[in-house]
């Protein structure tokens, strides 16, 4: 029987799941919208909503708790400086999950997970290293 099984395993070990959700939450905080599979998005939502609740508290202990979960100090800084104050008056429901069709190749159900009232200009900003096309060899 399936009593008391609160979360999906997603075919990963416990450590892999923890690391995956830490990385996905850092990406979601950075870009404020990401595309992933529907089961991952549904599991990520409470993970990030707890982080936003910590950011709304805003004290040093909450910041240290968020750093221990996300492990990306820069994104925790953004979480506490921009995202936490944005949702100060909202009592939960900071994340929206929208279905986005099926992935080509394995037909996996996709979803867009994003912050409600997100900053549209944050999407794709600083998404990786920039390589110049200079061929001065």
Curated annotation (Swiss-Prot):
Provide one Gene Ontology biological process annotation.
translation
Pfam families according to UniProt: Ribosomal_L17
* GO MF: structural constituent of ribosome
List the InterPro entries hit by this protein, alphabetically: Ribosomal_bL17 (IPR000456), Ribosomal_bL17_CS (IPR047859), Ribosomal_bL17_sf (IPR036373)
Q: Which positions are tagged coiled coil? A: none
One annotated Gene Ontology cellular component of this protein: cytosolic large ribosomal subunit
Task: Supply the alphabetized keyword list.
Answer: Ribonucleoprotein, Ribosomal protein
Q: Which family does it belong to?
A: Belongs to the bacterial ribosomal protein bL17 family.
Quaternary organization: Part of the 50S ribosomal subunit. Contacts protein L32.
Q: What is this protein called?
A: Large ribosomal subunit protein bL17
């Amino acid at each position: 029987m399936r009593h008391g099984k609160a979360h999906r395993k997603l075919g990963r070990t416990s450590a892999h799941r923890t690391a995956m959700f830490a990385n996905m939450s850092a990406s979601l905080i950075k870009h404020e919208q990401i595309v992933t599979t529907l089961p991952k998005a549904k599991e990520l939502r409470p993970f990030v909503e707890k982080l936003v609740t910590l950011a709304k508290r805003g004290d040093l202990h909450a910041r240290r708790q968020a750093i221990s979960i996300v492990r990306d100090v820069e994104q925790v800084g953004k979480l506490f400086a921009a995202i936490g104050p944005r949702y100060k008056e909202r009592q939960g429901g900071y994340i929206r999950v929208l279905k986005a069709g099926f992935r080509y190749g394995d037909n996996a159900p996709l979803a867009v997970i994003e912050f409600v009232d997100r900053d549209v200009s944050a999407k794709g900003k600083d998404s990786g290293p920039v390589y110049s096309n200079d061929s001065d060899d």
